[in-house]
């Protein structure tokens, strides 16, 4: 909100005097300060420090009071041809739900963050594969949004025009609304396999720059932004610690984490191979944010049944975890993460997931919150 210009001066014209203004009842996020000398234009002004202090109200979005969203990344290539039942759906929601015997309330999908891509691509995929479930409610859509350039280029504004166009398209899609988008931009930034790792300072600048554009275009009030590192920083240096990449509570709605045992080429100590231990780092980043396993699953480097048991022990051991997403596929580097690759582990998953705590539907209270936020963001 606009405020009247205020002039600060001191008797000598050159002391270290501080000016102070109380805007305790002004709701704003951005502050613009224009500094102008009262003397002639040739007078030099020496500004030592400017501080703006205040409180930011940052409430939590779409957190179920009881339970945890049951999610997955279920690509068709995660199923052998003979198990696809003739399906050609690249997002094999129906096959995965049949496999585990329970419906999903959250689906993960991916798109590169680069010029030439647009939101309508994802909205079309969303309409085809997420749709409505059998009780007339939507599944949540978790959107892995992957940059292909280093963070310094993003921090310098190289993607500004792309983000403006993209978020304007998101804001215009409310007529085709299917619930809020859960943006998960530039995940696993503390892992050396991403093109945007290793530069925490510019990562924070890039994230805030992207978020500010989204906010100014009316996207942040309704949708969700998930900040999501890898559970283990690689390399494990202090400079590459996940906390260094955190853009701050006021720029993040949920904390996410990629939760896997070591790859075939990596070496972890035994106690860092399983979910309950791997979750410890993300909890230290922010004290209050809700947490999700934004992708995870076992591999050939761990005991599959122990992994599944710990996955479901999150209910009692880690109550801040309010969503879990199983990544159901295999690759050469990480081994076979598919639930169906181990019949005993699959049967254990099918048994434990039947607990109503693992939500197959979005709760009514969350739907009410969705409608309220949607109406307030118009």
Task: State the predicted function of each range.
Residues 1, 14-58:
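Aromatic, loop-rich ligand-recognition surfaces of beta-strand-rich domains
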Residues 59-163, 298, 325:
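N-terminal substrate-binding region of glycoside hydrolase catalytic domains
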Residues 102-114, 242-270, 327-329:
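Aromatic- and acid-rich polysaccharide-binding/catalytic face
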Residues 211-240, 288-301, 323-329:
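Aromatic-lined carbohydrate-recognition surfaces of secreted/lumenal glycan-active proteins
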